[in-house]
Amino acid sequence: MKAERQTGLRNSFTTVIGRKLINTFVPSMMLTSVAGNDIFFRGLFKSPVLAFQSYRYVSILGQLKPSDGSTKSFKRLGRGPSSGLGKTSGRGQKGQKARGKVKSWFEGGQTPIYKLFPKIGFTNVGAKPLKELNLKRIQWFHDKNRLHLQPGEVLDMNKMRKLGLVTGPIKYGVKILASGKFHYNLPIALEASRASAKAIAAIEKAGGKFTARYYTPLGLRAHLNPQWFLEKRGRVPLQARPTKRRDIDFYSKEEKRGYLVMEKDKLLQDIKEAQNKGSRHFLKQNVKKSSLEIELEELSPEKDWVPVVSNSKVMNIKALDH
């Protein structure tokens, strides 16, 4: 019996586990000794129960199959008369049932997948994802003596990029977040596109100042890399002012620390003046006048100009006779 266990590829053995008689096959090379009902496996399992369960699962892997009735064979249509589903494919001749087809997404009446797992939410095509910078990273740079700022210098996005505080492409701007606010103690001025309310509170608590500044994509490129514009264009483009209502509203809020209200920008003053006058009064744009227009204004100043009064009215034939 021992010789058969040593030489045979697969042997049958019987053991009692949990008062059940189980017959299984195990490679003979795994068997080392049989003492009563205890079977020990070389280098793999200390317990015969674990060994049996492992080989039980292995034996099941070769017998996996779909549940009964869950699948069916494909019906080959239009493949000759001998199949019984040739010419008309089992639909007969003419009529509503012989024509048309089932939609590709129809699932036989069961709840379709597009109702089981519907698409939720949407992609905001107007979103402008900002680079995130936490206060703990600024504090860490200062502790490592890597935050090289002159007295009174503002830590703006250009400086953040040079120091390595923000890495990678900056497409729309930088937003300051409040992670590490309890350990932040730098009394410096920061300037970025936006900042969270908790970050603003932590910066001002440490004695610093934050300003949210608006940049267009071109203005941001000029701010981050002005040397490129000087070399390629010979000039640096001027920073544009916000034109969209939501941008003007954001950068004119004091709780957001927008630069329009923090620096008392003339644009905000003009907007408030126009709002006070009403919707009929609009801002007058400063347009460069030609020399001819200037001469005409000098010859006929606005104070001496009298508007032409129109005497037009509706007339009839009787009025014309008189």
Swiss-Prot record:
Segments forming a coiled coil: none
Q: Keyword Transferase: yes or no?
A: no
Q: Which GO terms describe its cellular component?
A: mitochondrial inner membrane; mitochondrial large ribosomal subunit; mitochondrion
The segment annotated Disordered runs over 69-99
Q: What is its main location?
A: mitochondrion
Q: Which GO terms describe its molecular function?
A: structural constituent of ribosome
Q: Is Ligase a UniProt keyword of this protein?
A: no
Q: Where in the cell is it found?
A: Mitochondrion
Look up the further comments and give them: Present with 5350 molecules/cell in log phase SD medium.
Instruction: Extract the PANTHER family matched here.
Output: 50S RIBOSOMAL PROTEIN L15 (PTHR12934), LARGE RIBOSOMAL SUBUNIT PROTEIN UL15M (PTHR12934:SF11)
Quaternary assembly: Component of the mitochondrial large ribosomal subunit (mt-LSU). Mature yeast 74S mitochondrial ribosomes consist of a small (37S) and a large (54S) subunit. The 37S small subunit contains a 15S ribosomal RNA (15S mt-rRNA) and 34 different proteins. The 54S large subunit contains a 21S rRNA (21S mt-rRNA) and 46 different proteins.
Q: What is the name listed in the Swiss-Prot or TrEMBL entry for this protein?
A: Large ribosomal subunit protein uL15m
Q: Which organism is it from?
A: Saccharomyces cerevisiae (strain ATCC 204508 / S288c) (Baker's yeast)
Q: What is the lineage of its organism?
A: Eukaryota, Fungi, Dikarya, Ascomycota, Saccharomycotina
